[in-house]
Amino acid sequence: MNKTIISSIGAALVCVVATVNGADLAGSAPFQFRYDEALSKLPDQVAPKVPGAHGGFAVDNKTGEVFFGLKGAGIIWMSNDLKEKKVLPVTEPMILEGNFHNTTVLYRGDGERFLALPDNEKHRVYIVSDEGKLASVLNSPMDLNDYYGGGGAFNPTDTEYADGKLYVADGYSAGNFISIADPWSASWTDTYFGGKASGAREYGLFGTAHGITLEPHTKRLAIADRANSRVQDFDFHGTFLENVNLPAGSLPCDIDFFQGNVLVGCLRGPSGYQSAPCYVVDKDGNLISEVNPKKDFGLELFTHIHNAAWKPVYGKGGKVEKLYALATAWNPGGFAVMEVVK
């Protein structure tokens, strides 16, 4: 199945910027956003490393905690309410030097929590405890197919944990495969899917398999095919299910889900855009809101967005008390927290 969300941004959505109680809002109800400067601050010790940020963060949907892998700094932990932030006491040089391209939370069968951190520069994936201790490393899957066996590059850009397996998107290589591993034994399975698309933009293949996200309700793997400005859905066996086109030139880096609504962080934006947007798309594929951090809030670092994620704040009994969107900028790096204002 093929869908096109929008062919013309102007015809599909009017981006509203209003002032309420002295605070600028951007986007369309029910997803209007307000920049939170206080919550966007990171620990002073990592400030020199932020301009080089090339990664993303993971939200633990059990606890609300956030983990953010940052090259040269290690791993930043954030509390459920985003008011507390600290750098985990990482001492392993391999982790400190890693170019963490994204972050994934995964729970082992015994309830222990770990993080998966793909490193596109060092060509591997780290499995790390939630205290920052290195547990294992996944190197290139040399025995998987002729591409890797012949010395093809392994430059992983994202991972997702689903059905007890770790799915690894190799988006910055010529292969563009999705490889599947057992993270607990640090071993690759013999299963993979995808590959490099041609100019015909074949379904099931990728221009850049940049981000991979589990849709929790449908149990699909949604893969942001950045170069082709689209999102492709697959089952856990790698069977292609659906294609959703985004505006040409938007270059989606990754997507995230909250109660059926999709947050899409884009590297650029359609023709005519001077800076990158985050889109909100509903469960029926309709574009219902848009926020552009640079244009709307004057965040000069946000010409390009490299990652965006929903951040619910959980109260007693798991009730969602607030909802934020987190975003990282690229080249230079930056970090922003935007509250969804009801």
What kind of region is each of these model predictions?
Residues 23-50:
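A short helix->beta-strand "capping" segment at the edge of beta-propeller domains
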Residues 303-342:
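Blade-level signature of beta-propeller repeat domains, shared across WD40, Kelch, NHL, RCC1
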Residues 176-179, 272-278, 333-339:
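Structural motif
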Residues 79-83, 129-133, 182-186, 235-239, ...:
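Short loop/turn segments that connect beta-strands within beta-propeller blades
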Residues 61, 66-71, 116-121, 129, ...:
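Conserved beta-strand positions in repeat-built beta-propeller and related beta-rich domains
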Residues 45-62, 93-112, 143-165, 198-220, ...:
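Beta-rich, blade/repeat-based domains predominating
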Residues 31-41, 85-92, 135-142, 188-197, ...:
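Beta-propeller fold detector
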